[in-house]
């Protein structure tokens, strides 16, 4: 697909996604019909039929979640995220990845994780970043080169970890703006989230966050430091106000697993605007 064809297909896709907002039950099937015609046999039949059931069937587990996304997330921002995820990451990315996997006879990842910096403004118990030092950094040009080479192979999805990646929020925003055909997700402690940053997220339209939190205030601050829990909730408040998409990343331990899997915890996170949750185990630092 040449540049003209790519632009034309994305333009049609953008209009269909925008159109689907007006009447999801009627227009989502039309959007998926277009997507299926474009993708051919690249994906399974369920890829295109399952979303229709989600939209129309109130008994479907994902039904309320789908409509909450439409209500809670900024429309232009969400439309752009959906288009980039479906077309650039899903269609173009998958097609290129599969081709290059055959050429190079090796796996090529659909998503790449990178640490812009090992620097962090917290010192959480057991965190490798707190033990290994704060002086390791990826230069902006190095990250640019990594993304450029990854896109050539078919990877259009990038995750930022650390350290605390928002220590380098300026560089992250630059990368997002320079690569509108990519999706970016930053794992962050949330303490550096502010109104200005959220406004930039909405301008980029391809960045979302996963905030670290670990259950109750007691279990969270026992490992992350006094006052961090309230700062994380404040970050959620700001992100929700700006209608940005965000989730949480939970590190589970023997000390907090009850707290981070309780209905009370889930209900509170949902009320605070959280749209996804991922669980990670504790990675202890080791000597080289």
Question: Predicted regions: what is each one?
Answer:
Residues 30-196:
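Conserved alpha-helical substructure of the radical SAM core
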Residues 140-160, 166-279:
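Radical SAM/AdoMet-radical enzyme domain recognition
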Residues 280-288:
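Conserved small/polar residues in nucleotide/adenosyl-binding loops
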Residues 117, 253, 285:
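Residue-level recognition of the GNAT/N-acetyltransferase active site
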Residues 126, 215, 287:
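Flexible cofactor-recognition loop at the NAD(P)H-binding site
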Residues 1-24:
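Intrinsically disordered, low-structural-confidence terminal and linker regions
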């Amino acid at each position: 697909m040449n540049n003209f064809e790519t632009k034309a297909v994305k333009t049609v896709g953008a209009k269909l996604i925008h159109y689907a907002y007006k009447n999801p039950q009627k227009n989502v099937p039309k959007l998926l019909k277009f997507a299926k015609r474009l993708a051919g046999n690249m994906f399974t039949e369920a890829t295109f039929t399952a979303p229709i059931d989600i939209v129309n069937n109130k008994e479907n587990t994902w039904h309320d979640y789908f409509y909450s996304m439409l209500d809670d997330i900024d429309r232009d921002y969400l439309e752009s995220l959906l288009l980039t995820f479906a077309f650039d990451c899903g269609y173009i990315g998958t097609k290129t990845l599969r081709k290059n996997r055959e050429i190079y006879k090796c796996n090529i990842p659909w998503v790449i994780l990178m640490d812009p910096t090992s620097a962090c403004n917290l010192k959480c118990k057991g965190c490798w970043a707190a033990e290994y030092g704060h002086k390791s950094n990826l230069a902006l040009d190095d990250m640019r080169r990594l993304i450029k080479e990854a896109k050539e192979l078919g990877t259009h999805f990038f995750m930022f970890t650390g350290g605390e990646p928002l220590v380098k929020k300026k560089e992250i925003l630059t990368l997002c703006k320079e690569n509108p055909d990519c999706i970016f997700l930053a794992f962050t402690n949330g303490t550096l989230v502010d109104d200005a940053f959220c406004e930039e997220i909405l301008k980029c339209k391809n960045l979302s966050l996963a905030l670290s939190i670990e259950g109750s205030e007691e279990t969270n601050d026992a490992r992350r430091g006094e006052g961090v829990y309230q700062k994380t909730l404040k970050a959620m408040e700001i992100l929700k106000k700006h209608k940005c998409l965000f989730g949480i990343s939970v590190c589970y331990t023997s000390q907090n697993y009850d707290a981070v899997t309780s209905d009370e915890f889930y209900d509170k996170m949902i009320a605070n605007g959280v749209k996804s949750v991922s669980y990670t185990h504790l990675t202890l630092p080791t000597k080289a």
